[in-house]
Amino acid sequence: MYSIAIISDLHDWHSKEIEYHLKKKNCEVIKLSFNEIELNFSKNKKIFFNKNLHHIDGAWVRFINSGSLEEITTKLTFIHLLKDSKVYTHNSAETIEKTVDKVRTTGILKINGIDSPDTIVWINKKDKKIKFNSLL
């Protein structure tokens, strides 16, 4: 039996559907919010996640709420460290980073020759105007 963690800042109908279908496949399901995840970087311990994540086989990442840059990057770090710990991660940090950031998504599409709408990105509307990929 696999043990799967569903990690989300908001457990809604989608988390319930994922849980239902995982249980139908005979998986043990643990639902956690990001604020329930603890890291302990003690030099005497190899495992640094809290006990809820010690023995999971996979993680299904759902919803990351808004927050400060530090809060969001910490949540992404949790996800990166799960993968680095050899835990299969659905919706990996890399995937989230590539799809949530519209500038990065557009850039990846352009680099790979995939058409997308013309895009302009402003860093500071008063001082600087940067055209992203020359209007693609």
Sequence positions of predicted segments:
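Redox-cofactor binding/interface segments in oxidoreductases and associated redox assembly factors
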Residues: 60-61
